[in-house]
Amino acid sequence: HFQLANVFCLPYNFDGQGGATNLGIPYIAERVTTILPDYPRGTLKETYEKIEKDLLEAIPLLEKYNIYQNDIRRFHFTAEAAYAFAARFYLYYNQPDKAKEYADKLLGSTPASQLRDWKGNYTGIDAANANAKALAYYRPTNAANLLVISLYSNYQFTTSSGESFTNSRYTHSNKCAAEETLWKNIWNVGRNRDEYNFAPYIYDKVFIDKVYQPKQPILDGERTIEVQLTTDEALINRAEAKIRLGDLAGGLADLNVWTQAYLRPGLAKRTFTQAEIKAYYDALPYADKTTRSPKKHLTKAHFKLHDGSTITEGTATEALLQYVLQCRRILTLHEGLRWQDIKRFGIDIYRWKKVDAGADTYEVPADGVLLGSDLRHAIALPQQAITGQIQQNPR
């Protein structure tokens, strides 16, 4: 239900009414016994209330019966997975105090020991063997993986082979990596993959232009494994919660713990001060139709800070939230969570298209802008659902 709500609904508090005026999703709480039943969508506020009710009832049971063999543990929704999910859920629900509470239950006061061993996990693996790295990434005995699922998909072929061509809808291009993500951040000002323990793969040909992280292994046929919840994401979520609550020092401390693990020692600066982060983002332009930048306007975020204010540009709070978004964007590349950050923070997005491959020229077409206030942030329901009498999203 949470996944469906975040695909087919607007972000919580989209219009400042706490989801009370926006469509939710049909919440299936009992067996359906008729063909084409009436599926009222209710409001997004009601959807979130029902998810919270189920979550709070489930957590004590998960804590009580939290007994699994280590090799199968991550294939189950354990208490630890529930804590990580709750941290994400309450951020989206605009309750950062509860997000921090559950992240604390998971991570405690010494989170470094619970993060992925970004250096050790890939030692001895052939750097040219992307699938071997993907297999190591999802390994179910890795304590940093809190929930892994098996699924049918061809996405792993799309990302790991030459099937992601220039300007295809799945491509994370070199231009995007250079000006918004992997090569454009406070720890790395050049096009260099060596700063990362989990080094990305780079294709920079005219017809195959992409940068990708090997996360979904190719198993047999169209089956793969996806990591749904990790301690690393939970730590960055806790950092966001702390910053939104006004604890800038605490949020920065969590981010420094993560960068120390994620970046290679000796090749990249791995910890930063609040002053350094603010200076870095102060010097960047905001992204618009003519400028690519990791720095986005956040003033339309669909939540208030701890003091009831909106995000003010040029403040330390804004700079640290920009940094949180950048860290999470890089950590969760290819996982779909960036779209949720775009929705929650009301970020305007621009679709850059290559117009001259030889000159490496890009532009944003007239229809290439999606404003943070656009109703299309709620994806249209498929025709099959409409035939089943479920109300379509407004446009």
Predicted regions span which residues?
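Hydrophobic-face positions in mid-chain alpha helices that act as interaction patches
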Residues: 38, 94, 100-232, 264-310, ...
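Aromatic-anchored glycine-rich loop motif in surface-exposed flexible loops
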Residues: 1-64, 68
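Structural register within alpha-helical repeat arrays
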Residues: 4, 79, 86, 231, ...
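C-terminal functional modules
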Residues: 303-395
